[in-house]
Amino acid sequence: MLRRGAASVNLNIEHADFDEWLEIREPKGDVNRQSLNLHQCAVVGDKFMRKLEAGDQEARVRWSKLLQKRKATGEPYILFKGNTNKANPPAYKSNSLKVHMTNICSEITLHTDESHSFVCCLSSLNLAKY
């Protein structure tokens, strides 16, 4: 039995398109702005959390929208980037490697940059045996 593939888009909560991005899974409006089967992960950094704690009104509104959407739909997932990078293994820390995103289930947090990417492989088949 085959399982449908899935993909996730990670976007920083402070990105200019964040509010529009929150709506891409809604089956309404312009179909060219919809992506009903794409999963979402909101990347939240320490800088944003400090703004939120300080009572920054714009941050509070954005955070509220995120939580309302999550309550209504179960998404987006939330990656706390600062906490993730604080928990990086020593090899990452000693080489200044940072995690910027995660996979759909959030169990894979690998360094990514212009030269490095990662993929979540749920299973594989070694065809060399056959």
Model-inferred region functions:
Residues 1-129:
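Active-site cavity-forming subdomains of large catalytic enzyme subunits
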